[in-house]
A protein has these predicted regions:
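Catalytic-core regions of glycoside hydrolase
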Residues: 1, 32, 108-285
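Aromatic-lined carbohydrate-binding surfaces of glycoside hydrolases
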Residues: 1-180
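Surface-exposed intrinsically disordered loops and tails
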Residues: 137-146, 449, 453, 460, ...
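Exposed aromatic-hydrophobic patches
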Residues: 234, 540-542, 584
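C-terminal functional modules
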Residues: 277-495
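Disordered, acidic Ser/Thr/Pro-rich linker "stalks" and the adjacent N-terminal cap
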Residues: 438, 444-447, 451, 473, ...
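Trp- and acidic/polar-enriched beta-sheet ligand-binding modules for extracellular glycan
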Residues: 562-584
């Protein structure tokens, strides 16, 4: 939360599905120890940083461990009893310092379909609003507010959260202080003016966007773990104006620290109202010095992280929403997110390696064809070394170290494969075989750097999955053939006329939707802008105000955010927001 406070984020939503008192046993109260050591410190951090710690409950779930424990609407007696228990649970956290609440119905039974929305969700939200207003009026003996700073803003996520265009006029009956969460037309939806305008036209309310990005939960269905360090071109669409959204909430990765990169961009998007894709590209470029060492000035370490992150942008959505007719959406259910595209044009990783891979697959590569590729892999190798030697934030480095080690070995193997191929083409096959063996060992070693996935299963950390790694595999096959070495089946790849990514990385489609950490961003395009997840550790150096861009002076009034460990609670949902909102 402290980190987020530097960048104008203003809301952090606590909704961890692995906390049984959040959903499965929502009636249960926290122990005194839990209040003192878990809830109260987070509430205090939120109040101090101006990034409100919002406590959420999900009382409508009726499955698994929560079966039969849900909030009931079948009789008036049950409703009043459960409402009393709901208030008591919220009250326990309000007494501990919480100053805003949220009510979630996502992934739960749609009780509105059974009893009517006005008799269920609308009624609960109205009753909670009235109750909050009563608490706001309570005074201490000296006349001061008993719950100073208590907000009546309630974040509400409906059971049908994707919204595909139906009227849903009942949303108009929800109190105006309630913010309605939507994922943008599909589970892995986008923040776009088109969606927001449709929702507002049909419901009379602006949506609070919940974007499942940079969420990497669906790599639980892959043989490896990846980081999502880009994708703003697909998930944060330009063209929004003030009031388009009521907020933007991001679902980050299990790795909280690198999630700050997407969170930073969402806050920038919210406050600065991107009007072109170039705005997003500039935000991506700018983000690394801020997430690495809280400064507008790039360092050797942050530049190294940037060069690697350029090749770690893909997001697997598991095919939850079906195939998309989008050039950036691969048939293997992956958003490519401009992976290996250098927005500055200085290092054409995609162009150079795509051209080389075509020649490698066709068996036509010559010694002269390896020069530019060698520059690419050498640059990436140097980037990994520079970041390892100069990390600006130890927490960040610790969380992504397996990927840095992966890049160390992958680039070493690529350079040796190129050397072996050139030696073989020059006729020195014996030396080429020895060099090839060294390259093969380095490639195998690159898969030994593991990290726990969503289900706490250790898997190898990988990157460069669209362009960089497939080209290394093509180099292996070419070097093996030209040197007379034998390529193990595990590394042999079928030839393809397609020189870009052939999706053969063990991905499997899944229809399970993500449920990890959620953050949020809220801003001018949203009422308030916001969003971030990260570990609650003291920030690095004191932040330096970011210089304004020519198009806006918003850099100096950037986002507020929040920090919290999403690795300790892998199923945590968090939200953050930034921007001006009513002080009520």
């Amino acid at each position: 939360m402290t980190w987020g406070g530097y960048y104008k984020m203003n809301t952090y939503v606590y909704a961890p599905k692995d906390d049984p008192l959040h959903r499965n046993n929502w009636r249960g109260l926290y122990t005194e120890d839990q209040i003192e050591n878990e809830i109260k410190p987070q509430a205090e951090a939120g109040n101090k940083s101006k990034v409100r710690f919002v406590y959420a409950l999900a009382p409508f779930h009726n499955d698994g461990e929560a079966r039969g424990k849900h909030f009931r609407f079948d009789t008036e007696e049950h409703y009043q009893k459960d409402l009393k228990e709901l208030k008591a649970k919220y009250m326990q956290t309000i007494d501990a310092g919480v100053r805003q609440i949220a009510l979630l119905a996502d992934d739960s039974t749609d009780w509105g379909a059974q009893y009517g929305n006005d008799n269920t969700y609308v009624r609960v939200l109205k009753d909670l609003t009235d109750w909050i207003h009563e608490l706001q009026q309570e005074k201490n003996d000296d006349g001061t507010a008993k719950y100073e700073g208590l907000k009546d803003t309630i974040l509400y996520c409906p059971a049908l959260y994707s919204y595909t265009g139906a009227g849903d006029a009942w949303y108009k009956d929800i109190p105006s202080n309630v913010q309605i969460v939507m994922t943008g037309g599909r589970t892995f939806g986008v923040a776009s003016k088109d969606f927001a305008d449709t929702f507002t036209k049909n419901t009379g309310r602006a949506p609070f966007m919940w974007i499942n990005w940079p969420c990497s939960d669906m790599n639980r269905n892959t043989a490896y773990q990846y980081l999502v360090m880009g994708g703003q071109n697909n998930f944060l669409k330009p063209g929004a104006t003030y009031g388009t959204y009521d907020g933007i909430m991001l679902n980050p990765m299990q790795q909280s620290e690198p999630s700050k990169q997407g969170i930073f961009m969402a806050a920038d998007y919210s406050w600065n109202l991107w009007q072109s894709e170039k705005d997003g590209q500039q935000s991506w470029e700018d983000s690394f010095s801020y997430i690495d060492h809280n400064s507008p000035i790039a360092s050797k370490g942050s530049r190294g992280l940037r060069d690697l992150a350029m090749n770690m942008r893909i997001l697997n959505d598991g095919g939850i929403d079906g195939a998309h007719k989008d050039a950036e959406y691969d048939a293997s259910t992956v958003w490519i997110n401009n992976e290996s595209v250098d927005y500055t044009g200085k290092l054409d990783v995609k162009g150079v390696l795509t051209e080389l891979k075509g020649k490698l697959d066709g068996g036509t590569a010559t010694a002269a064809d390896f020069s530019q590729a060698l520059t690419v892999y050498t640059t990436l190798q140097r980037a990994a070394k520079n970041y390892r030697a100069n990390p600006g934030d130890k927490n960040m480095f610790d969380q992504i170290e397996p990927w840095i080690s992966y890049w160390d070995d992958l680039t070493a193997s690529a350079i040796d494969y190129i050397t072996a191929a050139k030696q073989a083409l020059a006729g020195d096959t014996e030396t080429a075989k020895a060099t090839y063996a060294t390259a093969k060992a380095a490639f195998a070693k690159s898969d030994t750097h593991t990290i726990a996935d969503y289900y706490q299963r250790n898997k190898p950390a990988r990157g460069g999955l669209v362009i960089v790694r497939p080209t290394v595999q093509a180099l292996d096959s070419f070097a093996a053939k030209t040197s007379g070495s034998v390529t193990p089946d595990a590394l042999r790849r079928p030839r393809s006329a397609r020189t870009a990514w052939v999706p053969r990385h063990g991905m499997r489609t899944s229809i399970r939707r993500p449920s990890s950490t959620v953050t949020t961003a809220r801003s001018s395009g949203c009422s308030p802008p916001a969003a971030t997840v990260s570990r609650p550790t003291p920030p690095s150096p004191s932040p330096t105000p970011r210089p304004a861009r020519p198009r806006s002076s918003a850099s100096s009034r950037r986002k507020r955010a929040v920090t919290r460990s999403s690795t300790a609670r892998s199923n945590t949902r968090m939200q953050m927001a930034t921007g001006p909102r009513s002080a009520t």
